[in-house]
Swiss-Prot record:
Source organism phylogeny: Bacteria, Pseudomonadati, Spirochaetota, Spirochaetia, Brachyspirales
GO biological process: prolyl-tRNA aminoacylation
Location of the protein in the cell: Cytoplasm
Catalytic activity as recorded in UniProt: tRNA(Pro) + L-proline + ATP = L-prolyl-tRNA(Pro) + AMP + diphosphate
SUPFAM superfamilies cross-referenced by the UniProt entry: Class II aaRS ABD-related (SSF52954), Class II aaRS and biotin synthetases (SSF55681), YbaK/ProRS associated domain (SSF55826)
Similarity field: Belongs to the class-II aminoacyl-tRNA synthetase family. ProS type 1 subfamily.
Domain notes: Consists of three domains: the N-terminal catalytic domain, the editing domain and the C-terminal anticodon-binding domain.
Gene Ontology cellular-component annotations: cytosol
GO MF, one annotated term: ATP binding
Pfam families membership: HGTP_anticodon, tRNA-synt_2b, tRNA_edit
Disulfide bond sites: none
Originating organism: Brachyspira hyodysenteriae (strain ATCC 49526 / WA1)
Gene3D superfamilies: Anticodon-binding domain, Bira Bifunctional Protein, Domain 2
Entry protein name: Proline--tRNA ligase
Length: 578
């Protein structure tokens, strides 16, 4: 591609609303442009990178026997209703009506469409296993689009769905996908970690996320300082503390606690650690059930775990009126003792370690001392409802946990029969008996992968693309005018490189050399050849790798083979990670 013909409007400065490096550099390097909040257009260089990423994904999906399809972007309410997702997605779903007043939505993912596609075509156990996938546009009405293409309203995603008649078969495909994902991200030049994860609104049994460690990541990852335990904070467990071994026989004692609003205030007032308190939080489920959740005072409730304990129901903090109705007090003084209404009490396992606890008094400006489980109140549902945090103990080895920020690139699930049951998908097994197939679901964010490549590969000059996903592999820069022999030699090198399969750009623009070199650094092409009459007088051209910034002089007659060798070395460097 000649730059004189390429639509590449690079910018000296990023727009003021671009915050993170990948967003700034995508805009400056003319990969993309912001159209409106959460919506981006991709320019030619950006399209080439997206295509490279998609092709890597496609090759690895095909290698494990997956079949590429394309589902409609539009999905009907009728299709989303059996799975419950028409209601579950709520405001995230872009909804519309067609001219016949039929409710439709822009697809957020396509579990339902793939399920009925398989259901309509498969009748026998002999047709399993089957894996279908697409690389397609998705839509979600994000409440706060941010970080450029990392969280946007429209995005490209690879979503795959596998169908099985045995758990063992699903496990094999799940493991094959996990291996393929690891290979995909390594081929992109990305360093990722896989972590245990929650299945979220997708439902299912097993779940694993592939993360890029990044300070701009929206996910918190919990790591063990000794063993290989790691998990998304939504899923992370901790080693339970020992249960309290002794309790006093002190009677309950009400204490007037005016102007006390926080756990820190309570610590100072009672001159004791927050670990000696039991917090009580009132929640309301989507089915309008009111529950109380008790947890040790130094911990926070993990609402994902709580939702899972409730069968995946959406939950929210109860409003002030509801809290008053249930407890008789304003927010901040709830307690499992003496509730005004009969509700279920959930308790995190952490409160087992608390003896003679301090709890709210279900009365304004009041707390109760000397509280002990069973003697003073009973629990309906015990469980792990705490948010793991730095300093907790590993559930596997007991050593200290620490945390880092991460950005989710891929997510794989064992869905089980969630969708096949919803659509009454049945097939005949080898004994001619009806069975319900089970499914797996596997997603990769293509746009996020592009942004992550940049987040991990840039310097103060611009992007440093790994050769596997670079828009072009090499760029030839002509220093002199078109009338000069050096320009013709640069053009000859450009044509020859393209003819032997090196994807090459030619900067033939009538621009100052400084502008050309700055653009080279900014757009991150791995290999650069600079051709000028002064160097040609010595029989050489300048060769430079973007990553190392080291330049060497190479004889004109050797430059083609030299570029071929360096290109192979760059690919070998990536392949050595596989």
């Amino acid at each position: 591609m000649r730059l004189s013909k390429l639509f590449m409007p690079t910018l000296k400065e990023a727009p003021s609303d671009a915050i993170i490096a990948s967003n700034k550099l995508m805009l400056r390097a003319a990969l993309a442009r912001k159209i409106s909040n959460g919506l981006y257009s991709y320019l030619p260089l950006g399209v080439r990178v997206l295509n490279k990423i998609s092709n890597i994904i496609r090759e690895e999906m095909d290698a494990i026997g997956s079949n590429e399809c394309i589902m409609p972007i539009l999905v009907s309410k009728e299709l989303l209703t059996p799975s419950g997702r028409w209601e579950r997605f709520k405001k995230e779903l872009f909804r519309l009506k067609d001219r016949n007043d039929v409710d439709m939505a822009m697809g957020p993912t396509h579990e339902e469409a793939f399920t009925i596609t398989a259901q309509n075509e498969i009748q026998s156990y002999k047709d399993f296993p089957l894996t279908l996938y697409q690389i397609h546009t998705k839509f979600r009405d994000e409440i706060r689009p941010r970080f450029g293409v990392i969280r946007s309203k429209e995005f490209t995603m690879k979503d795959a769905y596998s169908f099985h008649i045995t758990k063992e078969c699903l496990d094999k495909t799940y493991n094959d996908m996990s291996g393929a994902y690891t290979k995909i991200f390594k081929r992109m030049g990305l360093d990722t970690v896989s972590v245990k994860a929650d299945s979220g609104a997708m439902g299912g049994e097993g779940s694993e996320e592939f993360m890029v460690l990044s300070e701009v990541g929206e996910e918190t990852i919990i790591f063990c300082s000794k063993c290989d335990y790691r998990a998304n904070v939504e899923k992370a467990n901790v080693k339970e503390e020992e249960a309290a071994k002794s309790y006093t026989d002190k009677a309950l004692e009400e204490v007037h606690t005016p102007d006390i609003k926080t756990i820190n205030d309570l610590e100072k007032f009672f001159n004791t650690s927050s670990k000696n308190f039991i917090k009580s939080i009132i929640y309301k489920t989507e089915e309008d059930e009111i529950i109380l959740v008790a947890i040790r005072g130094d911990l926070e409730i993990n609402e994902t775990k709580l939702s899972n304990a409730l069968g995946g129901l959406d939950i929210e903090l109860a409003d002030e009126e509801t809290v008053k109705e249930v407890t008789g007090a304003r927010v901040g003084f709830a307690s499992p003792i003496g509730l005004k209404k009969k509700i279920r009490i959930f308790a995190d396992n952490s409160i087992k370690s608390v003896a003679d606890a301090i709890v709210g008094g279900n009365k304004d400006d009041t707390h109760i001392k000397n509280v002990n489980i069973e003697r003073d109140f009973n629990i309906d549902v015990w469980g792990d409802f705490r948010t793991a945090k730095e300093g907790d103990r590993c559930p596997q080895c007991g050593e200290t946990l620490y945390q880092k920020k991460g950005l989710e690139l891929g997510h794989i699930f064992k869905l089980g029969d969630k969708y096949t049951e919803a659509f009454n998908f049945k097939v005949l097994d080898e004994n001619n008996k009806e069975i319900t197939p089970i499914m797996g679901c596997y997603g990769i964010g293509v746009n996020r992968a592009l942004a992550s490549v940049i987040e991990q590969n840039y310097d103060d000059k611009g992007i440093i693309f790994p050769i596997s996903v670079a828009p072009y592999e090499a760029i030839v820069v002509a220093i002199d005018k078109e009338t000069e022999d050096s320009f013709k030699k640069a053009e000859e090198i450009y044509n020859t490189l393209n003819s032997i399969g090196v994807e090459t750009m030619f900067d033939d623009r009538k621009e100052r050399l400084g502008v050309k070199l700055n653009d080279c650094d900014l757009i991150g092409i791995p290999i650069r050849i600079i051709v000028g009459k002064k160097s040609l007088q010595k029989g050489v051209v300048e060769f430079k790798l973007r990553k190392s910034q080291e330049s060497v002089e190479v004889k004109v007659e050797d430059i083609i083979e030299y570029v071929k060798t360096k290109k192979q070395e760059l690919f070998n460097e990536i392949n050595s990670r596989l």
